[in-house]
Design a protein with these regions (language model features):
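Bacterial N-terminal signal peptides
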Residues: 9-19
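N-terminal carbohydrate-binding accessory modules
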Residues: 27-78
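The substrate-binding groove and active-site-proximal loops of carbohydrate-active enzymes
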Residues: 49-60, 83-101, 148-169, 267-285, ...
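Aromatic-lined substrate-binding rim segments of carbohydrate-active enzymes
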Residues: 64-139, 284-298
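Polysaccharide-binding and catalytic clefts of secreted carbohydrate-active enzymes
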Residues: 143-329
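Catalytic-core region of carbohydrate-active enzymes that cleave or remodel glycosidic bonds
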Residues: 288-301, 327-425
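Aromatic- and carboxylate-lined catalytic core of secreted/periplasmic carbohydrate-active enzymes
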Residues: 381-504, 515-518
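C-terminal beta-sandwich/jelly-roll accessory domains of carbohydrate-active enzymes
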Residues: 465-471, 486-589
Length: 589
């Protein structure tokens, strides 16, 4: 069943929701499609989640919660990601304390914020550090994962039914608490199940039960999934099965040869660490699916799992292996179909590449953790503009420098203002995101007969920071096409030029001096008649206006950006450190 359709629910599910979640269950947060985009609706209305995730220990006492929620509101957030910790919720086996989640919900309402709870249950950053002491001490009942050489890890084994039942029981109690405390207010709008699941030291668990599972036949549901999705499999998995990352005429027979009846994991996927990771991904996902089904049974809302990424060239076992990583999406979609979103935690370089890997037709983009820095704001703009993101969230939002907070506050204010237009145009191929730095400086967008050449603002010669050796802060923004020859350009540190396609093809490259004019001697060929005759029409800028966006999506004129501010009609520009929304109207001549 399509997961997004599933959220709307069947009659039976609606009945359950009414029983557990109150008479206003129809207003629960849910996911819905608009074109190629997936939007989250809260109270029946779509919204952009402008989030921040609290540091891990920021919600462990009432006083801190009161303080941090007020701070989050002041910093421009509309949604806060908050840990819900098993060890504090069930400090004694069978005895539950929801005073902290209760305070979170109350303070969120007081500050007009939405909440996404993060279930720190059996695993947090691979480790089982948030399990209660009674769980930790009873390793016979709640066994640990083991390395190849028999060393126990502080990682609960995904193959233990006792662990699953204890984890699921506590999670179930949390979901019931939320359903009773928040049945009609929609304060809690999404749940994260576990946190950055994965294996460390070894790529898989070598405990007795894990070994037995690895020696057994590959489960039938995975066999069926592979057969049904052959051409759509991720290149990583396809290569493991066929030897090629691309589907060829021989791929079907290669897969059939692997998927013989009763074939074990080693026979289908091999015996290296990458095969180990595939095995663990399936069983991690299968475990999570049991918690997801419990959440659906009690109070339906969007569910996601987050991934610590396999960056810096690390191999399985060196990063938290077998989590919801981009190259393992097939295992997670197969074994955890009730999970709506596989979400990346992006801390390392390559933000655009990671975002691109996770925005897929079957997986909307939600970024629950991103490094909190002075570039956070423009990265948020890029995610919403380029990938129709559901939400963006810097981690450790309760800390950070003044520059970090200025970046996110300014960008979130801009996104809130842009939201009527973004929510209207998402999924229709009418929005683009921009993100530039000192190495990645330019992007060319072809929109019908118009070519938009977009660059970092420091590519212009007259800002001394562009050439004095300073590190370039990232520049970024959003382009929204309102109509032919009619655009919104919003962001910080970007410049956009417009040309017809034929004009762009005939473009003469010129190096500009610090005054913005061509350097000496660059017009010689043109003056001597050496250049071919220009053909076709050109695009001109009719006007560039700075505008505000009204709540109904109409534009409110603020001021005209002409003369030096548009380089005499050559471009639309937003300098580094500025946050503006520009309305650009073009014409042809």
């Amino acid at each position: 069943m399509n997961k997004i359709t599933y959220l709307a629910g069947t009659a039976a599910l609606s009945a359950m929701m009414a029983m557990f979640c109150g008479s206003e269950a129809h207003a629960q947060a849910k996911l819905q499609k608009q074109g190629t985009a997936t939007q989250i609706t809260v109270g029946g209305k779509p919204m952009l989640l402008l989030c921040g995730e609290l540091s891990n220990s920021a919600a462990t006492c009432e006083a801190d919660i009161i303080s941090v929620m007020r701070t989050c509101k002041e910093r421009g957030l509309n949604t806060v990601l908050v840990p819900a910790q098993w060890d504090l919720i069930e400090p004694e086996e069978g005895k539950f304390d929801f005073s902290l989640p209760k305070t979170v919900i109350e303070q969120a309402r007081k500050n007009d914020l939405k909440v996404i709870f993060l279930w720190f249950g059996a695993w947090k950053n691979s480790m089982s550090c948030y399990t209660p002491l009674w769980f930790k001490e009873n390793t016979r009942k709640y066994p640990r994962a083991m390395t190849r050489r028999g060393k126990p890890l502080e990682i609960a084994s995904a193959f233990s039914d006792n662990i699953l039942q204890a984890d699921k029981n506590a999670f179930s109690k949390l979901m019931k608490f939320i359903s009773e405390a928040d049945s009609s207010r929609n304060t809690v709008i999404m749940m994260q199940i576990e946190n950055e699941i994965g294996m460390l030291e070894d790529a898989r668990d070598y405990s007795d039960k894990a070994q037995k599972a690895f020696s057994s036949a590959v489960p039938e549901d995975l066999i069926k999934y592979i057969r049904s999705n052959g051409k759509k499999l991720h290149p990583h998995l396809l290569k493991m099965l066929t030897g090629s990352e691309k589907w060829t005429k021989d791929s079907h027979s290669a897969i059939n040869n692997r998927l013989k009846k009763g074939a074990t994991w080693a026979q289908v996927f091999g015996t290296d660490i990458y095969a180990d990771e595939v095995f663990m991904a399936y069983y991690h996902a299968k475990y999570v699916e049991q918690l997801a089904l419990e959440a659906r049974r009690i109070c339906d809302m969007p569910l996601y799992v987050n991934a610590a990424l396999n960056s810096r060239g690390r191999k399985p076992g060196e990063y938290p292996s077998a989590g919801p990583l981009a190259h393992l999406v097939d295992l997670w979609h197969c074994a955890a179909p009730s999970i709506d979103i596989l979400a990346p935690d992006i801390y390392d370089t390559g933000f655009k590449s990671w975002a691109d890997q996770y925005k897929q037709p079957e997986n909307p983009l939600f970024i629950p953790e991103s490094r909190f820095c002075r570039n956070s704001g423009v990265r948020a703009l890029y995610a919403f503009g380029e990938h129709d993101a559901i939400g963006f969230s810097p981690f450790d939002i309760d800390h950070g420098s003044a520059d970090d907070h200025k970046s996110i506050k300014e960008s979130y204010a801009m996104l809130e203002e842009l939201s009527p237009l973004l929510l209207k145009y998402q999924g229709k191929g009418l929005t683009h995101g921009l993100l530039f730095d000192g190495n990645d400086r330019e992007r060319v967008i072809v929109d019908g007969d118009i070519t938009l050449t977009c660059r970092h603002n420091f590519t212009l010669p007259w800002d001394p920071r562009a050439t004095d050796g300073s590190e370039w802060p990232e520049g970024g923004g959003i382009i929204i096409k309102l109509a032919d020859m009619d655009y919104i350009i919003a962001g910080n540190g970007i410049v956009v030029e417009f040309a017809t396609n034929s004009e762009k093809e005939q473009e003469e490259k010129k190096i500009l001096g610090e005054d913005g004019f061509a350097q000496k001697g660059q017009n010689t060929d043109s003056q001597n008649g050496a250049q071919p005759k220009f053909k076709g029409m050109r695009a001109g800028i009719g006007y560039v206006d700075e505008v505000a966006i009204n709540k109904d999506g109409t534009l409110k004129y603020l001021r005209r950006e002409n003369g030096d501010q548009s380089h005499q009609g050559r471009h639309a520009r937003i300098s580094v450190g500025e946050y503006k929304i520009l309305h650009v109207k073009l014409y042809k001549y």
